[in-house]
Amino acid sequence: MNAIAKALAVGLDVRTASLVSSLVHDGKSWTVVLADGTELKADGIVVTSPVPQTLALLESGGVVLTPNDADALAAITYDPCIALMAVLDGPSGLNEAGAVDPASGPIDWIADNFLKGISAVPAVTIHATPEFSRTQWDAPDEAITEALLDAAQLESSVLPGSVQIQRWRYARPSVEHPERFLRLSDMPPFVCAGDAFGGAKVEGAALSGAAAAQAIESALGRNA
C-alpha cells in the first residue's frame, strides 16, 4: 500500500524514523521539534496522525486552540483494534475471496493473505472487534492468541513462533469530523486531515489528503 505514497514523494525531502516531540509556532511560522532535539522550520503544516496524538504535540508546544477548534477535535473518537498475524501449515479454509466478516464473536475480520496474493505461504490476518480490543487491551499476547484462533476455527494449524500481535489504539474513527479537513484558526497555516475527516478507510483518507493539500497551498498563497 505504501507504493502510492512512495511514488508521490519522489523528489521530496522525506524523513523517516523521526519522532516528533512538539509543534511550536511564533505567530508567523512553525517549528517541528524532534525527540533528538532537531528543529525543522515550516511555513505551514499538514498532520494526518490520529487526533489525540496531534493534540498532544500541540499541547507540548504550548499551542492554545480556539474553543471552536478544540471542541471540533475533541468530538472525534476512535476505536482500538488488536490484530493477529500468523503463518499456517496448510490452507486456511476461508472462501475464495480470501476474507470473512463474522457476524458475532471476538473477530471483526479475517483475511487469507495467500488467497489475496500478498503472501507466498498460507498466512492469515485477524482483526478483533472494538469491544474485544478494548476489554483485552492489556491481556497477555498468549491469551489473545488463544481466544482469536479458537474463534477463527481455521482448517490448518499455526506454525510455532509465527504469531504476531499488534495493538492499534486509534485503529479507526468511530466519530468523524464532517468535513475533509480542519484548518486551525488564529495561527500559522495548520491543517488536520486523515481518515477521521469526512470518511474513514483508505478512500476517505486519500480524499482528505487531497483536500488538505489544496487548503495548505491556498493558505500559503501557492497554486495547488
What are these regions (language model features)?
Residues 1-7, 15, 138-147:
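Short beta-strand to alpha-helix junction loop
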Residues 16-31:
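A conserved short coil-to-beta-strand element within the FAD-binding core of flavoproteins
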Residues 35-37:
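Glycine-centered tight beta-turn/hairpin loop motif at sheet-sheet or coil-to-beta transitions
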Residues 39-96, 158:
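Central helical "cap/lid" subdomain
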Residues 74, 215-224:
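Active-site-proximal substrate-binding core of FAD-dependent oxidoreductases
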Residues 85-136, 143, 147-155:
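Active-site substrate-recognition segment that forms the wall
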Residues 124, 180-213:
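Short FAD-binding loop at a beta-strand-to-alpha-helix junction that anchors the flavin cofactor
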Residues 146, 151-188:
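Flavin (FAD/FMN) cofactor-binding core of flavoprotein oxidoreductases
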